[in-house]
A protein has these predicted regions:
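Intrinsically disordered, low-complexity terminal tails
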Residues: 1-53, 313
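Assembly/oligomerization interface modules of large self-assembling protein complexes
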Residues: 42-127
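Short helix/loop capping segments that flank catalytic or ligand/cofactor-binding pockets
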Residues: 99-102, 141-142, 216-218, 298-300
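Hydrophobic alpha-helical bundles in membrane proteins
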Residues: 114-119, 141-142, 172, 207
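Alpha-helical scaffold segments that mediate packing/assembly in large oligomeric complexes
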Residues: 127-201, 313
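Extended, solvent-exposed, turn-rich assembly/linker loops in the middle of proteins
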Residues: 171-239
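Sequence/fold signature of self-assembling virion shell proteins
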Residues: 221-313
Length: 313
């Protein structure tokens, strides 16, 4: 997208019917390629000209990103997203997480919090998938249908990244250790009140749990709130009586539930954008579409996440 924008800047189209479209969308109009809707073109439409074929990797990248954004719950856990160009990155580390502004007398020194670089590199993971098919199987298929398949690849990448985020909270990121889990034989409302208290001065605004954990949470009588039920039926979003968003992580280890302040707990690090193997894409005539994304997670402030473990029946 950035390369296309440099070649065909949007500023040139102010006051025209094409205002509001980015460079890629304008090129689709130029070559009369429809990628969505009932009247979407077949895949081979991209390859009618060499210039049109050059747009195909960007189409794949956008379709995958749409799938990632559609299902991603990572944003419910991370405080910030950092984009880097390389593979080496160190996050910050606070020597003292005491944030209270103490009263000082005139001329006295103010208390300080020192930030330094983390002791280790943030581990990055490459997640991706290869969509393999013969040219004959795809050439007459509509782009709208291919977008659905590519979106599922994006959804799979987003799900894996969500599990990576939770793994960093549980096991640490190499510089900071994993969170502390309080033990409980059976989950109760009192356990969550203790979590709420242990997080102070941070706020409890997100709870991450696996399928078993979510089911047990929803069985707690205090969580059977009428308004929360209406919100779930109307929007599909789970909200607890404590005001925290429930994040369902299907691959998360059973017997553990994490409570965190999503504004202070995690940093997401992305190395580049969604990558498409465009060389094989053209040379092998769509036999294989390789899509990948590189990302990792780092803990920011250790006190911003706590956990509770329970006995799995």
């Amino acid at each position: 997208t950035q390369v296309l924008e440099e070649l065909d800047r949007s500023e040139q189209y102010r006051g025209t019917p094409l205002e509001g479209l980015d460079a890629f969308q304008r090129q689709l109009k130029r070559f009369d390629i429809k990628v969505s809707g009932p009247g979407s073109d077949p895949v081979e439409r991209f390859f009618a000209t060499s210039a049109g074929a050059a747009l195909f990797p960007e189409y794949v990248s956008r379709a995958v990103r749409q799938g990632m954004e559609r299902v991603s719950q990572v944003n419910d856990l991370v405080a910030t997203v950092t984009r880097i160009d390389g593979m080496d990155y160190r996050t910050i580390d606070a020597e003292d997480e005491t944030w209270q502004a103490a009263v000082v007398s005139e001329g006295a020194q103010l208390p300080q919090t020192t930030l330094r670089l983390g002791s280790g590199l943030v581990p990055l993971h490459k997640r991706g998938r290869v969509l393999s098919s013969s040219y004959e199987a795809l050439r007459f298929q509509k782009l709208d249908l291919l977008t659905v398949a590519l979106g599922q690849i994006g959804a799979g990448i987003a799900a894996a990244q969500l599990e990576d985020a939770v793994d960093v909270l549980i096991n640490g990121d190499g510089s900071k250790d994993g969170i502390t889990f309080a033990s409980s034989t059976s989950l109760s409302y009192a356990d969550f009140l203790k979590l709420w208290g242990s997080l102070a001065p941070y706020q409890l605004n997100a709870i991450a749990a696996g399928t078993d954990g979510i089911q047990k949470l929803l069985q707690i009588s205090e969580f059977k709130d009428a308004q929360a039920g209406l919100n779930f039926q109307g929007t599909g979003k789970l909200v607890t009586p404590l005001g925290a968003a429930l994040v369902h992580v299907p691959g998360m280890e059973e017997g553990k539930i994490i409570a965190l302040d999503k504004n202070c707990a995690l940093e997401m690090v992305q190395a580049g954008d969604v990558l498409v193997d465009s060389d094989k894409l053209i040379d092998r005539q769509l036999e294989k579409i390789s899509v990948s994304a590189i990302a990792g997670f780092a803990r920011i402030f250790e006190g911003a996440a706590q956990g509770v473990s329970y006995t799995v029946e």
